[in-house]
Regions:
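Catalytic phosphate/metal-binding cores of nucleic-acid and nucleotide-processing enzymes, i.e., regions
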Residues: 1-96
Length: 96
């Protein structure tokens, strides 16, 4: 993982926690392409996130595409903090 991608993960997890979401790093347990994080709102609504290098430099593998298709609307690829904030506010209905 590149430094830029790790920094993005940390910043996005901080934002999620400020909104009261649990941020769970998913283990690489032999399932290739599994998303990086699971974000959970109280009550169970969940969003799987695959972080990609900021600036569009990250490549999506065939395995990552499989998981994106399998998880459907509860999966997103994120390459910016602003994009992440917008996604979680809309997905989890976090409007004030």
């Amino acid at each position: 993982m590149k430094k830029e991608e790790r920094k993005l993960e940390v910043e996005c997890c901080t934002i999620a926690r400020k909104f009261g979401l649990a941020a769970v790093k998913l283990e690489k347990n032999g399932n290739k392409g599994i998303p990086d994080y699971l974000f959970i709102k109280r009550g169970g609504r969940s969003l799987y996130v695959e972080f990609k290098r900021p600036g569009g430099g990250g490549v999506v593998s065939a395995e990552q595409r499989f998981w994106a298709d399998f998880l459907g609307d509860s999966h997103v690829f994120v390459d910016s903090v602003g994009g992440f904030a917008k996604v979680i506010v809309e997905f989890f209905d976090l409007w004030d």
